[in-house]
């Protein structure tokens, strides 16, 4: 639905914020003197903590590293790794304390963003960004946002803004689904196939019913897959319980807690001095040289942590030792805290690991590249989300082209 003279864009604020998750409500608080308008597609704040969490989901970072600097966690004696429900309570307390809820329009899904500023301001020297980006508020609207209310796809209201803050995140909304050859996909499987995004929508009773007494296969070995395997093991206790098989292509480093040989984890990666060990974008020649000179120290720290993890966890026993150094997973946020008793359930046979690079479906389960077959009733794809596709779906050109980074990673400010 295009903007026309009969349907001109509404201008109610200078600044728009898309998303009311952690970043969205923080941005709203910081920009409160501009009375920003926040568009949230769902009926509540919280983002992934509300829509992409299991019953057992907990924070992966220490509580003190996740709280807002201007709003300490109210219950200081609570768990160091709060549950997703405790995090939602904290976010609601933050939003109420700083009165940001008044700026949020719920059930308002942004479906398109347009840049309507002077096209001559598009400067190749800034990677295709308009030169206005150096003056955040140019004094006149340069962005138009199309919004659907209450999932009414036939009706789009347009709004005009001087500045837009995109806080929709990388995770949720668009699942990353593997591609399969003809007659090798989910359509030939007689059981149930779902992505973790769909599993998150189940309440505890429905989730237990789905897993209990079923042969479950979880594809993936990152945090969502590990948590799901643990929930499956809990639902299948007793002699009638079935085992859960995790299909692992690339093992990633996992940690039991945030202490290494008795030393706090933050000592290795969260101090001011440790920042000199790691490369950063646009860091300059001198800092790059210093980082190069300190690379043996960086490697030594990584091996020191790996030695602890290999001693503490049975990674080699289950062929789950990663081939890459620990620092790679830490730097790319692919490290996960393993749930308590996870390997105890593996020792009891409730969680089984299967290493495989390629697999496909057959009528009774999944088949591997060596032609071996695994029977299954339920297959859950813990294969992540397509954050790049999610952003490209609303960003206009040339801005969406900035997501196509040579390394394949999504370039973020921090």
Regions found by a protein language model. Give the residues of each.
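N-terminal FAD-binding dinucleotide-binding subdomain shared by FAD-dependent oxidases/monooxygenases
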Residues: 2-16, 20-198, 202, 211, ...
């Amino acid at each position: 639905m295009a903007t026309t003279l009969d349907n001109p864009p509404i201008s109610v604020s200078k600044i728009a914020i898309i998303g009311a998750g952690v970043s969205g409500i923080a941005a709203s608080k910081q920009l409160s003197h501009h009375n920003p308008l926040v568009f949230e597609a769902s009926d509540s704040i919280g983002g992934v903590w509300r829509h992409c969490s299991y019953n057992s989901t907990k924070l992966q970072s220490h509580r003190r590293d996740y709280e807002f600097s201007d709003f300490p966690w109210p219950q200081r004696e609570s768990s160091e790794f709060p549950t997703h429900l405790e995090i939602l309570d904290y976010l609601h307390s933050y939003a109420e304390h700083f009165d940001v809820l008044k700026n949020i329009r719920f059930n308002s899904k942004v479906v398109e963003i347009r840049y309507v500023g002077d096209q001559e301001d598009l400067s190749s020297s800034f990677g295709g960004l308009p030169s206005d980006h150096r003056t955040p508020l140019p004094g006149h609207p340069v962005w138009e946002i199309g919004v659907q209310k209450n999932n009414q796809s036939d009706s789009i209201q347009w709004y005009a803004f001087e500045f837009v803050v995109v806080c929709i995140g990388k995770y949720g909304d668009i699942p990353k689904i593997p591609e399969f050859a003809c007659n090798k996909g989910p359509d030939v499987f007689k059981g149930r196939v779902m992505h973790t995004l769909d599993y998150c929508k189940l309440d505890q009773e429905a989730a237990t019913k789905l897993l209990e007494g079923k042969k479950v296969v979880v594809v993936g070995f990152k945090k969502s897959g590990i948590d799901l395997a643990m929930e499956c093991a809990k639902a299948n206790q007793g002699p009638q319980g079935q085992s859960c098989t995790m299909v692992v292509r690339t093992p990633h480093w996992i940690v039991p807690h945030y202490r290494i040989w008795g030393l706090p984890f933050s000592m290795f990666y969260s101090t001011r001095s440790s920042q000199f060990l790691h490369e950063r974008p646009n860091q300059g020649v001198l800092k790059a040289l210093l980082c190069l000179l300190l690379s043996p120290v960086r490697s030594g720290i990584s091996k020191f942590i790996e030695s602890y993890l290999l001693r503490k966890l049975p990674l080699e026993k289950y062929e789950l030792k990663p081939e890459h150094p620990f620092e790679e997973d830490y730097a790319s946020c692919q490290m996960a805290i393993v749930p308590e008793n996870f390997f105890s359930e593996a020792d009891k046979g409730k969680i089984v690991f299967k290493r495989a690079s390629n697999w496909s479906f057959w009528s009774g389960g999944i088949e591997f590249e060596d032609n071996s077959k695994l029977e299954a009733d339920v297959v859950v794809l813990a294969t992540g989300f397509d954050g790049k596709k999610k952003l490209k779906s609303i960003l206009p050109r040339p801005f969406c082209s900035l997501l196509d980074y040579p390394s394949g990673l999504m370039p973020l400010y921090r």
